[in-house]
Curated annotation (Swiss-Prot):
Quaternary structure (record): Interacts with ESR1. Interacts with UBE2I/UBC9. Interacts with SMAD3. Interacts with DDX20.
Gene: FOXL2
Key word Protease present: no
Positions where Phosphoserine occurs in the chain: 33
Organism of provenance: Bramus lutescens
Name the UniProt record assigns to this protein: Forkhead box protein L2
Cross-link (Glycyl lysine isopeptide (Lys-Gly) (interchain with G-Cter in SUMO)): 25
Biological role: Transcriptional regulator. Critical factor essential for ovary differentiation and maintenance, and repression of the genetic program for somatic testis determination. Prevents trans-differentiation of ovary to testis through transcriptional repression of the Sertoli cell-promoting gene SOX9. Has apoptotic activity in ovarian cells. Suppresses ESR1-mediated transcription of PTGS2/COX2 stimulated by tamoxifen. Activates SIRT1 transcription under cellular stress conditions. Activates transcription of OSR2. Is a regulator of CYP19 expression. Is a transcriptional repressor of STAR.
Principal place of residence: nucleus
Keyword Transcription among UniProt keywords: yes
């Protein structure tokens, strides 16, 4: 008798078939263990990762979770280190940042200790106006808050000047109207544009006069005074003034002596320029009655004298010795003054005429022929 084995399909079906109508349940995950207080246990921060909170949020968090709602600086440090182990290292850096935020942020108020004593440090608390600066207790999001208006100091109140209601003190000359609405004074204008444009130029000091020019100017002034005292008709005074003017003019064409006013009728012996034209003085007396070529006058000459000593009369086209058209510089009377010799040395024509004057008795014809040229 042979044994029969069941088919594999039937065996698999028998294993999968429920026994007594029961279904097989899959295993479930174990429930989480309850934490303290019946809630879920908070995740511990990673000591190597910096917390995502600003220093203002850390300070506010420490003050709010304190019992008295105020903490000293050391208490804030201890809370941050205990709450976030990341700040156990590099204490110097973040503690300086905590101090700066306490001093510069207006939401933190310093409260002095009661009674003083040996204990140092002040309390820090939150401003009541900044209690809700974080949205719904989220320290990662901070609201934009408007700063409360604080009145300015008394000396900077709007509409008032820096030195009181008058706006001026001690004669400073700044009026109250010159200040703006916030009490700040406009810069004073000490120099106006009109004053700068209408200012007078500074006088320039005159250049010093050379020593030689001073000496000659003094001599010329003394000679002019002597000539004025002697009278305009005196030939000696004119010769003295004219002789003194010669050496001063020799220092340059723009000498100071030439610009000095000379007596009327006196001509400079250097360039023939003098003062305004005036009536010529009467001719001086001569030792002999015949005319000579070196006695020329600027006024109308008398009618020509008849020729003498056998000299022929000049033709009508030639110049006569007494013609007013040839107004040469008048020669001074013969004198022994040194100025006369200097003038003759500077002007060769006058020197020739003076030499011809002294030799006139012997060379009368040669003088007339030389002048006719």
């Amino acid at each position: 008798m042979m044994a029969s084995y069941p088919e594999p399909e039937d065996a698999a079906g028998a294993l999968l078939a429920p026994e007594n109508g029961r279904t097989v349940k899959e295993p479930e995950a174990p429930p989480p263990s309850p934490g303290k207080g019946g809630g879920t246990a908070p995740e511990k921060p990673d000591p190597a990762q910096k917390p995502p909170y600003s220093y203002v949020a850390l300070i506010a968090m420490a003050i709010r979770e304190s019992a008295e709602k105020r903490l000293t600086l050391s208490g804030i440090y201890q809370y941050i280190i205990a709450k976030f182990p990341f700040y156990e290292k590099n204490k110097k850096g973040w503690q300086n940042s905590i101090r700066h935020n306490l001093s510069l942020n207006e939401c933190f108020i310093k409260v002095p200790r009661e009674g003083g004593g040996e204990r140092k440090g002040n309390y820090w608390t939150l401003d009541p106006a900044c209690e809700d600066m974080f949205e719904k207790g989220n320290y990662r999001r901070r609201r934009r808050m408007k700063r409360p208006f604080r009145p300015p100091p008394a000396h900077f109140q709007p509409g008032k000047g820096l030195f009181g209601s008058g706006g001026a003190a001690g004669g400073c000359g700044v009026a109250g109207a010159g200040a703006d609405g916030y009490g700040y004074l406009a810069p004073p204008k000490y120099l106006q544009s009109g004053f700068l444009n209408n200012s007078w130029p500074l006088p320039q000091p005159p250049s010093p006069m050379p020593y030689a020019s001073c000496q000659m100017a003094a001599a010329a002034a003394a000679a002019a005074a002597a000539a004025a005292a002697a009278g305009p008709g005196s030939p000696g005074a004119a010769a003295v003034v004219k002789g003194l003017a010669g050496p001063a003019a020799s220092y340059g064409p723009y000498s100071r002596v030439q610009s000095m006013a000379l007596p009327p009728g006196v001509v400079n012996s250097y360039n023939g320029l003098g003062g305004p034209p005036a009536a010529p003085p009467p001719p001086p007396p001569h030792p002999h009655p015949h005319p000579h070529a070196h006695h020329l006058h600027a006024a109308a000459a008398p009618p020509p004298a008849p020729p003498h000593h056998g000299a022929a009369a000049p033709p009508p086209g030639q110049l006569s010795p007494s013609s007013p058209a040839t107004a040469a510089p008048p020669a001074p009377a013969p004198t022994s003054a040194p100025g006369l010799q200097f003038a003759c040395a500077r002007q060769p024509e006058l020197a020739m005429m003076h030499c011809s004057y002294w030799d006139h008795d012997s060379k009368t014809g040669a003088l007339h022929s030389r002048l006719d040229l």
